A protein has these predicted regions:
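FAD cofactor-binding and catalytic pocket of flavoenzymes
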Residues: 80-105, 110-112, 131, 135, ...
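Residue-level detector of alpha-helix initiation sites
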Residues: 10-11, 295, 509
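Glycine-rich loop(s) and the adjacent beta-strand/alpha-helix scaffold that form part
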Residues: 22, 26-52, 245, 254, ...
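Short, glycine/acidic-rich hinge or "gate" loops at secondary-structure transitions
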Residues: 38-40, 153-166, 458-466
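Conserved redox-cofactor binding core of oxidoreductases
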Residues: 53, 57-84, 95-98, 102, ...
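A glycine-rich dinucleotide-binding beta-alpha-beta segment and adjacent secondary-structure elements
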Residues: 89-90, 202, 219-220, 257-260, ...
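N-terminal glycine-rich phosphate/pyrophosphate-binding loop and immediately adjacent elements
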Residues: 2-136, 140, 144, 309-330, ...
Length: 534
């Protein structure tokens, strides 16, 4: 029997496990665990990769051209390449339906952060106002995670929104487009700040110097496909590190169905189903730690109550950041060369301070280098040949600002369980008040569009898209931490009320959802909870 039975190998699970192992205790980690494929030609740039692969069309676009992004009402300029298909592969045992919510889930080794873009921002006291612990209780664990994963950052105007208390590495070199925008901001800061908008360098979990087995970024331009040098952090790298501890056991290929409870409500283990054989298999532990991601952990919790009581409750308070995508063009860069061999994701970030933490806005600005051509070309008002020619001229001038609004727990947004006709447990997600923040959203759109114009970029109104709920991939709030003694909530240490030795270490336990990207905080909070789990 393991001392700690951890479910899930994503950002929360691996950092909880590493903290426990470092103090000499045993951990068994259960996982579906789909694996990342090996990266071909790991030293080649993206351009060299296209030239040297035997079949670049299939290897890069996929055997069925699944990497091609086709035009649609809201077409993102980035798709997920075949090398990332393992991240979104789902076992047959998983079932989900939703209303007003279009989520992504992952059963990969490393979870959804295997496909993240590395944004890593510390929360401030405003962000934690709804949480039952203080910023001072979280900050030491940011330092631990930063030391483990490596984060490139620079002190700038964004420190008013996100502290820099952890140890950070030197920032990545800027691409020319991002450098031009940041330089324009430095000259016109007062005008931009008057709109409530502040710009700075994006803080990214990318190495600018070697760390353990991982190498520093050398600007190969292969970030979208998966960094072959492991410069861009992924939780699967920490999972690999866990295997060095004698007290660690990793069990992939199992789907956790429910938590096992004794007559006193004490968690004693879990019931799983083996993916290969389909047989049920029990695992026991002194405590059970839900770290499968907010949605999967919610399904396990609800399935447990369905089995124990014959019915499962609704879990109100499902949260997801409002996500806005704002393409722009910087006219002075038309005709310039495109820097394909560079870091492909965001180099810049932005912040807006609202009247309360729930009104704050956080964003990241990307100069498009590795974007998909098809959705952009198809939107131009010319024939295809002319559109391609125009795109070639303006490509170096294109960029995109993605920004997010904070979210709060509200009763209309729920997770619940449905037992299907074939006795499967299906997670049902409903986001019932999608219009609650449209006023704040429109204010942010107007301010950010004006700010971009001040620094020389034009963001056409017709191209700005308010994306469907679920697009942010920041899900939280179904089993919130609170000081209130209520059912289906957690204490500050992640322990679930009404049960013993059951812990939630992922976003399901978040009390509110700040605008900032939460992966860094998920890891730091998991470390905090692990320290509290004695």
């Amino acid at each position: 029997m393991a001392r700690h039975l951890v479910i899930g190998s994503g950002a929360s699970g691996v950092h909880y496990a590493l903290t426990i192992l470092e103090r000499g205790e045993e951990v068994t980690l259960l996982d579906v665990g789909y694996e990342r494929p090996a990266a071909p030609l790991p030293d080649a740039t993206y351009t060299q990769l296209k030239e040297q692969l035997a079949d670049p069309l299939s290897d890069i676009l996929g055997e069925r051209s699944e990497y091609v992004v086709y035009p649609g009402p809201v077409s993102k300029p980035y798709g997920f390449p075949p090398s990332k298909s393992y991240v979104f592969r789902q076992p047959a045992a998983w079932s989900l339906t939703s209303r007003g919510f279009d989520p992504l889930v992952s059963f990969a080794r490393g979870g959804l952060a295997e496909a993240w873009t590395g944004g890593s921002y510390e929360l401030d006291e405003r962000d934690l106002a709804a949480f039952p612990f203080s910023l001072g209780e979280l900050q030491p664990h940011y330092a631990t995670v930063a030391r483990r994963i490596g984060i490139a950052a620079e002190r700038d105007d964004l420190e008013r929104f996100s502290p820099m208390t952890a140890g950070y590495d030197a920032p990545l070199p800027l691409d020319a487009h991002s450098a031009q925008l940041l330089g324009a901001y430095a000259r016109k800061r007062q005008r931009v700040n008057a709109l409530g908008v502040y710009l700075g360098r994006s803080r990214v979990a990318v190495l600018t110097k070697p760390l353990g087995e991982r190498a520093e970024c050398t600007q190969l331009g292969r970030c979208l496909m998966g960094c072959p040098r492991e410069s861009l952090y992924a939780p699967s790298y920490t999972l690999r590190q866990l295997h060095r501890f004698p007290g660690f056991a990793y069990v992939p290929g199992v789907f956790v169905e429910r938590i096992l409870l004794d007559g006193d409500g004490r968690a004693t283990g879990v019931m799983t189903r083996e993916l290969a054989a389909g047989a049920e298999k029990r695992f026991t532990g002194d405590r059970v730690v839900l770290a499968a991601g907010a949605l999967a952990s919610s399904r396990i919790y609800l399935s447990t109550l369905q089995h124990e009581n014959g019915a499962a409750p609704e879990l109100p308070g499902l949260m997801d950041n409002r996500h806005v995508m704002m393409p722009f063009v910087t006219p002075s860069r038309v005709g310039h060369d495109v820097e394909i061999a560079s870091y492909q994701f965001h180099h810049l970030a932005l912040g807006m301070r609202g009247n309360s933490a729930g009104d704050d806005v956080h964003g990241q600005i990307t100069a498009l280098k590795g974007a998909q051509v098809h959705p952009i070309v198809s939107s131009l008002p010319f024939d295809f040949r002319t559109s391609l020619s125009v795109f070639g001229r303006v490509r170096a001038a294109l960029g995109i600002a993605n920004f997010w609004l904070a979210d709060t727990r509200r009763a209309a947004n729920v997770a619940e369980l449905r037992v299907t006709d074939d006795a499967r447990h299906q997670l049902v997600l409903s986001y019932g008040d999608d219009r609650s923040d449209l006023g704040r959203t429109n204010q942010a759109i107007a301010a950010i569009r004006k700010s971009l114009r001040i620094i020389g970029a034009i963001a056409p109104k017709s191209q700005t898209a308010v994306l469907p709920r679920g697009s942010s991939v920041h899900y939280a709030g179904t089993l919130p931490m609170t000081n209130d003694e209520r059912k289906h909530t957690c204490r500050a240490d992640g322990s679930v009320r009404g049960f013993e030795r059951l812990i939630v270490a992922d976003g399901a336990a978040f009390s509110s959802l700040p605008a900032k990207n939460i992966t860094f905080t998920l890891m730091a909070n998991a470390v905090r909870i692990a320290h509290a789990s004695q």
